[in-house]
Amino acid sequence: VEGSIISEEAKSWIAQRIAEKSRDEPQWISGDFEESVSTFPKPNYSKYQEMSITDIFKQFVNQRFIEHLVDESRRYALFLNYSDSNITADEIRCFIAILFVSGYNDLPSKRHYWDSNDDMKNYAVSQSMRRDRFLQICRFVHCSDNTKIDPNDKAWKIRPLMNMLKESCAENFEPEEHLSYDESMIKYFGRHGCKQFIRGKPIKFGYKMWCVNTKDGYLVNFELYQEKIQNQIMSMKNYLPVPYYLC
């Protein structure tokens, strides 16, 4: 239609725009204001008060965690043609305990915990496991199946254990307000594609982790920083926050 006459299509479009605008406008009513914001419940950790330190530790390094290490270590021993490794769950628990002790009682080598000299020997370690058995488990201990490699994950060798720890952290978390996320460094001086150097940090060399924590320091979730994956995330920074995968 020519001239000043408006087409039916234009009239329909104008009517639609007016209807949309009227829907978006708030409808005000008179009355007293009532606060509708509910109070977030406080976390209840009373069930952990009667637990020992060992019991709490087992909430995270649980039976499933230990059995997975046993199965994968036996699998790797078979891969190396050692059919009689016979690694047990109790041995894996003892092995982990020795690793914890070695973090506090630092010696030039692991063999020194069984040294004949009293100034080197650690009786708690030497009486819990034989030296040769410990070194054998060191050779066989494995966290994942070598036939199932994820080329996109630099942490594939420990990914199953990381996922189990994440599940345990989530299961034992009591929801609360004021969670925060930030970077955390795990000291490491060896060679790995994920090792970082951050100048000005108390721990300059090691693995950088994205962590979600409560105000009291409880670790809710975590993820290892991997540059390739991080670059993919940064390409979407206008749409997603960097540590979106922690939620």
Please tell me what each predicted stretch does.
Residues 1-245:
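N-terminal initiation segments
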